[in-house]
């Protein structure tokens, strides 16, 4: 992190012998939080079995984000995807799916309301991003499911960035995708540090 702070490096690789929490503490102490970023979070770059890169956020830092934090996680993860996977995916803006156990009103619950509110906040803060929610994972990922559950969505069935509503779901999802789905997982990639 000292080399990143001094400008001698663009990024740092850490964590082989330390926990994510230790790496995060060092990053915060040396780099601090980037201006305009509300919360430091993480994402995993997942290279699926078919070779397609997607990003999962947050899978390692914020246990139960509030609406504003969830919106920040979505923006940060979209920016990380754009910087790392966008060039190998043909460029363009990522399609950001705000995930829930509900798709477009299929369920009502305060947790669904949180995802809806965060989706609206991302759209307001970042009109340059293509974002939609609330979406179940299958509606965000599978075109045939999207056609039934979320017709007309600019994201459903074609998401590049998957934003999970809490750390439980994000952490479990990346491990299931890696272990059962045969994906390669790269991360956690810390995002929101000033460096």
Describe the predicted segments one by one:
Residues 1-156, 160-195:
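Anion-binding alpha/beta catalytic cores of soluble intermediary-metabolism enzymes, centered on
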């Amino acid at each position: 992190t000292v080399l990143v702070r001094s400008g001698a490096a663009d990024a740092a690789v850490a964590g082989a012998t330390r926990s994510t929490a230790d790496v995060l503490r060092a990053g915060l102490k040396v780099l601090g939080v980037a201006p305009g970023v509300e919360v430091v979070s993480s994402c995993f770059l997942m290279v699926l079995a078919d070779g397609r890169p997607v990003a999962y956020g947050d899978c390692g830092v914020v246990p139960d984000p509030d609406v504003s934090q969830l919106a920040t996680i979505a923006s940060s993860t979209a920016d990380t995807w754009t910087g790392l996977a966008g060039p190998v995916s043909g460029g363009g803006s990522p399609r950001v799916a705000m995930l829930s156990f509900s798709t477009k009103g299929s369920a009502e619950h305060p947790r669904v309301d949180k995802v809806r509110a965060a989706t609206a906040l991302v759209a307001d803060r970042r009109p340059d991003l293509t974002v939609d929610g609330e979406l179940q994972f299958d509606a965000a990922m599978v075109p045939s499911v999207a056609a039934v559950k979320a017709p007309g969505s600019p994201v459903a069935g074609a998401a590049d960035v998957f934003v999970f509503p809490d750390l439980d779901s994000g952490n479990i999802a990346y491990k299931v995708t890696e272990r059962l789905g045969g994906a390669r997982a790269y991360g956690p990639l810390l995002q929101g540090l000033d460096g």
